[in-house]
């Protein structure tokens, strides 16, 4: 009986330690049908450094109204089909769904969380215009704080107007 209790308590302790250190990863696991639909997380918004909404995924996937902003942030926010992965969404998934260790993902207000990036919509769009039709990358950061102000990769496309490349 003593060995059984020892193993039981050891297993419980192991589970609690794993829960305390890994719960955020468990919650934001992309296979969770409670949070994801069609490989997209089901709630929250992503804004730039001053609060401009870049992506709202509380009801589907709504991008910025500005076409240049949609193009310049595509590689950060991904597309609807998952052809370009959404690294920002993956990184901030737990906070966007409103997860905390006490309540889990339960949210009485039924609103998602907000992820505020250090990116600047203005700088992203200026970099996109400066790149024109050239291929490459633009990166701008604040060396004092480490904040990324701009990270642009071209070529890019507007996720609201996906090009047909079947005949290319």
Please give the residue ranges for each predicted region.
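Periplasmic/cell-envelope proteins involved in peptidoglycan metabolism and beta-lactam response
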Residues: 1-168
């Amino acid at each position: 009986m003593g060995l059984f209790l020892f193993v039981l308590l050891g297993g419980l302790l192991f589970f609690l330690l794993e829960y305390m250190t890994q719960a955020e990863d468990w919650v934001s696991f992309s296979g969770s049908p409670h949070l994801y639909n069609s490989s997209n997380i089901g709630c929250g918004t992503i804004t730039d450094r001053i609060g401009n909404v870049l992506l709202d995924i509380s009801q589907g996937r709504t991008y910025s109204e500005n076409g240049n902003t949609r193009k310049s942030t595509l590689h950060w926010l991904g597309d609807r089909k998952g052809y370009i992965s959404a690294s920002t969404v993956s990184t901030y998934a737990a906070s966007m769904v409103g997860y905390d260790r006490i309540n889990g993902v339960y949210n009485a207000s039924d609103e998602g969380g907000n992820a505020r990036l250090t990116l600047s919509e203005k700088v992203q769009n200026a970099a996109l215009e400066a790149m024109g039709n050239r291929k490459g990358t633009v990166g701008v950061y604040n060396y004092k704080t480490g904040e990324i102000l701009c990270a642009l990769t071209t070529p890019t496309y507007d996720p609201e107007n996906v090009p047909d490349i079947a005949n290319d």
